[in-house]
């Protein structure tokens, strides 16, 4: 199985399975001298780890990260950073009934058809458990970004659960960390709690929309055509489990606008060019404008539900299946820190590419 690595100069390779002894990431390309500690990385992993409330899977994993290489006396050395997270709460017996069956909506059938072998215990490599390694790697990227671009801030949040969206008029950055859904709308969080609790008790699930905003992004990240910043951001988000659609800025809604409505008009401000709006999501021609970079994606409902469904076995015989085990009723909740991590990795990668090509700062002066 190939394609376990992403990135150009800042490269991340993840490894491990849901029910294996451990999983982790090898991070190559982190600049030397970046302050990195296990404690600092753990902050981000704690945001993602399961079992923290009734709205996420009750699998109890400490998700304690171990730095095995690439860091000396609290600083990166420039060599590959090996990160490991041991699995502690596997319950493989829950999956014995599906060893010969394919779960609808999961990667079971495509993995089997492509490779002729699959780890049915929790999905193996296709499990969202793999994203713990991404969050650890994202912590490294955040540390490097913090050293290179101190004012850059990456924040993910949920804007929709099932058919229920937030009220943008109530958007409050301070609310995001105050509820289990990472939403900026406190009233929506209360409504979603009752809604999701009902689905959880019924053994069902629901999808969600997640938005990630990076504030303080320098001008000039990305390149035309095949190295667009939005190309890599879209690919990064689409690689997250259960993601089925990605938008940049106004996204699909831009198709219903006129040219006048969609135009981000440009004015000269005291510190340089300013824009009347941000329909472009902070990226023009694949290159960052200095505005907020805004990415949005949709995740499908968790496929592991307690409803009896029709499927087939490896031999092609019809069968019924109920997915046992411990699962998230809304994977969008824990997708938030994963999306933040992927955004951090892509932005650092493009910052390093930009500095390597043109040096620090934009080349074309205005004013």
From Swiss-Prot:
GO terms for cellular component: cytosol. Keywords: Amino-acid biosynthesis, Aromatic amino acid biosynthesis, FAD, Flavoprotein, FMN, Lyase, NADP. Reduced FMN (FMNH(2)). InterPro entries: Chorismate_synth (IPR000453), Chorismate_synth_AroC_sf (IPR035904), Chorismate_synthase_CS (IPR020541). Disulfide bonds: none annotated. PANTHER family: CHORISMATE SYNTHASE. Its EC number is 4.2.3.5. This reaction introduces a second double bond into the aromatic ring system. GO terms for molecular function: chorismate synthase activity; FMN binding. SUPFAM superfamilies: Chorismate synthase, AroC. Belongs to the chorismate synthase family. Its cofactor is FMNH2. This is Chorismate synthase. The keyword NADP applies. It catalyses: 5-O-(1-carboxyvinyl)-3-phosphoshikimate = chorismate + phosphate. FMN binds at residues 125-127, 241-242, 285, 300-304, 326. Pathway: Metabolic intermediate biosynthesis; chorismate biosynthesis; chorismate from D-erythrose 4-phosphate and phosphoenolpyruvate: step 7/7. Signal peptide: none annotated. PROSITE patterns: CHORISMATE_SYNTHASE_1 (PS00787), CHORISMATE_SYNTHASE_3 (PS00789). HAMAP family: Chorismate_synth (MF_00300). One of its GO terms (biological process) is chorismate biosynthetic process. The gene is aroC. Homotetramer. NADP(+) binds at residue 48.
